[in-house]
């Protein structure tokens, strides 16, 4: 394994883990986070599956503000140095676009090289239209290849 050519990507829960990793290490040359949950506090309020937070958190966010905030990826975004692509479907009600927009905005404010890719009319998974699924894969590989050739 060439430790100078490590990349990370993941979608949904894997997107959460991608953001978690790049918020804790600089070992990756580039990252692509696909439809991640960024802010657990707001996830409970606008996701189509808000009850799932009960499996991971005791009580509602307003009763456990510090805990929800500490687990939200905005709490570690200040550490990110890895060039990052954020990719989400605009019709995603599982991990809605505002989470990706928040994360991208934070990366931009921090000066991290980043791009936000919005896929129109796509829900969670970005696979309703085959062309969108192919586009998702091309975006991921394009971002990784950009840093593979440096």
Sequence positions of predicted segments:
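Active-site-proximal cap/loop segments of hydrolase catalytic domains
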Residues: 1-150
């Amino acid at each position: 394994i060439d430790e100078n050519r490590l990349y990370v990507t993941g979608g949904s829960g894997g997107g959460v883990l991608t953001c978690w990793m790049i918020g804790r290490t600089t070992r990756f040359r580039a990252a692509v986070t696909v439809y991640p949950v960024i802010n657990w506090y707001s996830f409970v309020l606008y996701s189509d599956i808000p009850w799932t937070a009960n499996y991971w958190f005791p009580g509602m966010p307003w009763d456990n503000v510090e805990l929800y905030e500490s687990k939200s990826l905005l709490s570690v975004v200040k550490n990110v140095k890895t060039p990052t692509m954020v990719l989400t479907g605009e019709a995603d009600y599982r991990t809605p676009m505002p989470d990706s927009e928040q994360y991208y905005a934070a990366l931009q404010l921090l000066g991290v090289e980043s791009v936000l890719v919005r896929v129109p009319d796509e829900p969670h998974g970005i696979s309703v239209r085959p062309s969108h699924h192919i586009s998702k894969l091309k975006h991921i590989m394009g971002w990784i290849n950009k840093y593979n050739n440096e």
